[in-house]
Amino acid sequence: MDDDTAPRAVAGWFKIAAIASIAFMALGCVSYLMQVTADREQLTVDQRALLDAAPTWMWAAFAVAVWVGLAGTIALLLRKRLAVNLLGVSLAAVLVQFSSYLLVRQLRDLMSLDGFVVPVVIVLLTWTVFWFAWSSRKKGWLN
């Protein structure tokens, strides 16, 4: 390996931040699985209404966001440059997923103002993970 392609030594906190990123994306995967396998009989009327109003493309974007995001964070821990691309796709999918709350009237009508807090936090955390990967690549920490 020459000096241009050899990864540089990483900051001591890199591994902790990468593992925290994996945990965040893994929680997203668990949330996705819980929602797509939910027993409709156990849900409240409001929860069923939200599921019924959600378009198929929202669920597809949700799946892409969490599973590609998990792959991206694993690549980040392994210090692979591919992490940036995967996490960029994940971020785009999160934006598509949560745009449904603005674009689909039934979803918007069913959501309370408090219901928008979680999507905003998820977008911010996903952006932070993407930025972490991008910044790590710029610093030469990824190969």
Q: Where would I find each of the regions flagged by the language model?
A:
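Topology signature of small-to-medium multi-pass alpha-helical membrane proteins
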Residues: 1-143
